[in-house]
UniProtKB/Swiss-Prot annotation:
InterPro entries: SCRL. Keywords: Antimicrobial, Disulfide bond, Fungicide, Plant defense, Secreted, Signal. One of its GO terms (biological process) is signal transduction. It holds the Pfam family SCRL. The gene is SCRL8. The keyword Transferase does not apply. This is Defensin-like protein 250. It comes from Arabidopsis thaliana (Mouse-ear cress). Residues 1-23 form the signal peptide.
Length: 89
């Protein structure tokens, strides 16, 4: 009887182990686009990344990920960054 109880407890603990060791991953969005005021800064390639990052609560500290800036009418610019983590909701 003791052996069965020990075996049962061991199985339960081992089944919990993978869920404890796997870190929670944030979802990744396929694209992120947003329009901001001002013109595109051709010397600062992180401009769009920083602008998008500042509009979200907390996406962590990431390196810029394939961001582009496209001039728009009326002194606006379209920022497009691929593969940024989705903002938490």
């Amino acid at each position: 009887m003791k052996l069965a109880a020990i075996f049962l407890v061991s199985c339960v603990l081992l089944s919990l182990l993978p869920s404890l060791t796997i870190a929670e991953k944030r979802p990744w969005c396929p694209t992120r686009k947003q329009i901001f005021d001002g013109s595109c800064n051709r010397t600062d390639y992180t401009q769009c990344f920083n602008d998008l990052r500042n509009t979200w609560d907390d996406i962590g500290d990431l390196c810029p990920t394939d961001c582009t800036c496209t001039p728009q009418p009326q002194n606006k610019r379209l920022c497009y960054c691929r593969y940024l983590p989705c903002p938490s909701t």
